[in-house]
């Protein structure tokens, strides 16, 4: 299969260059400084854990490269409210347009509709995008180890923390652990979907658990219902990033409620 991640990153580099030309770095930094106060993403997750509940990072996603259009009837504010009312800890909103049909407007609409903290879900390759995330109102950013070098990971994490945001560090396998050794974020996501082939296996999370002892592990992709949640919780994983299962449901709130 074509290396999907490299294709996405090449497109992203062109996209960021165009965005910088439209809104220069100085302006985006000023917008970030003026953004609404940050809501604590990590505290919201820990609040669920203190209640002995699974912490669900509920994703707002219209489409994906592997599945195409997932939710034709796509209204971010309504989806966000359904998630909040059903007990989600946080939101994740796709802002990548070419591959996921996302938009910064979706992030803004979702955040304005609820009190939950919101993650910008995108492929961050430049510190400009970290400022951009805060300018749009994001409370957290995703950093993908497979997409970045060690120095980039460390710089982008430091900048996100300087701006008050939580970092969700996404890992996929043992080879990525070494370049993340200096990162301080407690939130470590394990993507059960291989970003190079898009195949899914929950074993990805289980294989990395011993190396992530003491961290708040987020299992991402492939969680389809309560059985998967209970399976992971029995093994010490209590935080779940779930998108497609919810996005395909007629009643999103009811689908989230099935996990509790």
Swiss-Prot record:
What chemistry does it catalyse, as a reaction equation?
1-(2-carboxyphenylamino)-1-deoxy-D-ribulose 5-phosphate + H(+) = (1S,2R)-1-C-(indol-3-yl)glycerol 3-phosphate + CO2 + H2O
Entry annotated with the keyword Transport: no
Keywords assigned by UniProt? Amino-acid biosynthesis, Aromatic amino acid biosynthesis, Decarboxylase, Lyase, Tryptophan biosynthesis
Group of enzyme by EC: lyase
Q: In which pathway does it act?
A: Amino-acid biosynthesis; L-tryptophan biosynthesis; L-tryptophan from chorismate: step 4/5
A Gene Ontology annotation in the biological process aspect, one of them, is:
L-tryptophan biosynthetic process
One term of GO molecular function: phosphoribosylanthranilate isomerase activity
Which PROSITE patterns does the entry link to? IGPS (PS00614)
Task: Tell me its EC number(s), please.
Answer: 4.1.1.48
Q: Which family does it belong to?
A: Belongs to the TrpC family.
Could you tell me what this protein is called? Indole-3-glycerol phosphate synthase
């Amino acid at each position: 299969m074509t290396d999907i991640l490299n294709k996405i990153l090449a497109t992203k580099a062109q996209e960021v260059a165009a965005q910088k030309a439209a809104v220069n770095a100085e302006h985006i930094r000023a917008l970030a400084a003026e953004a609404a106060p940050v809501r604590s993403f990590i505290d919201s997750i820990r609040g669920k854990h203190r209640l002995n509940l699974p912490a669900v990072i509920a994703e707002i996603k219209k489409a994906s490269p592997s599945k195409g259009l997932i939710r034709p009837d796509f209204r971010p504010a309504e989806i966000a409210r359904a998630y909040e009312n059903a007990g989600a800890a946080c939101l994740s909103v796709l802002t990548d347009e070419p591959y996921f049909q996302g938009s910064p407007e979706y992030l803004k609409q979702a955040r304005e509709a609820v009190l939950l903290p919101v993650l910008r879900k995108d492929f961050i390759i430049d510190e400009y995008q970290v400022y951009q995330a805060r300018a749009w109102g994001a409370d957290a950013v995703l950093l993908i180890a497979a997409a970045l070098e060690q120095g980039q990971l460390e710089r982008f994490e430091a900048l996100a923390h300087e701006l008050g945001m939580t970092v969700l560090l996404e890992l996929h396998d043992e080879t990525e652990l070494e370049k993340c050794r200096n990162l301080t974020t407690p939130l470590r996501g394990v993507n059960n979907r291989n970003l190079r082939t898009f195949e899914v296996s929950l074993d990805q999370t289980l294989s990395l658990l011993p190396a992530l002892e003491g961290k708040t592990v987020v299992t991402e992709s492939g969680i389809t219902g309560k059985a998967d949640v209970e399976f992971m919780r029995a093994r010490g994983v209590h935080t779940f990033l779930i998108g497609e299962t919810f996005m395909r449901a007629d009643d999103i709130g009811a689908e989230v409620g099935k996990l509790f």
